[in-house]
């Protein structure tokens, strides 16, 4: 006879509708245009996604972190669903922190993602699976990650917090390794972030922690120890 899980509760499903990692040649189903992002966002909400994690793209699929890029789809998504809108401040590793933060600062969403530490960000292994690309930028985007550090310094994180917290925006703290959890604890100790802490543990991206079950348990144990009952834990497996 099984014992009921005393910690069971409602589960929050987040849909990252288009992201910034994958490129158009990888799937004809990747939303690129504003209309595609709108349609897929509303469909995700209808299917049960309580949070819509939103990025924007240029017409050729390149990541677009301009406020104007988000303006093309945000109003209709907000009007069409009551799901929580989460605007990325991660954007793309190739962008400055000011560029990455601009949409969240402009539109003041309920939720914004916030990467909690610098890291190598290896996308180039995907070149082993894809050899033909529709756009020239795609191969360079992936190949360039061999020599790419995704910068999220303490100063960068402070910039995002200082820019957005006063607008009422809460954060999804993107943590790609246990060091990122300790960085979050550091900001909590300084009073720059407040509980509860919505932690997104990201597994399987080259440069961060792996995706073995032991890795997952290690991240969860560390987060539990650091944040206790103030933790709201979420899991993302890199595709």
What are these regions (language model features)?
Residues 3-29, 131-137:
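N-terminal small/glycine-rich loop or linker at the start of catalytic domains
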Residues 7-13, 48-50, 79-85, 108-110, ...:
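Short, well-ordered coil/turn segments that N-cap beta-strands
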Residues 17-38, 89-97, 146-151, 172, ...:
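Active-site mouth loops of central-metabolism enzymes
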Residues 25, 50-72, 202-207:
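Glycine-rich, proline-tolerant flexible connector loops at the mouths of alpha/beta enzymes
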Residues 113-239:
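Catalytic alpha/beta core domains of metabolic enzymes, predominantly
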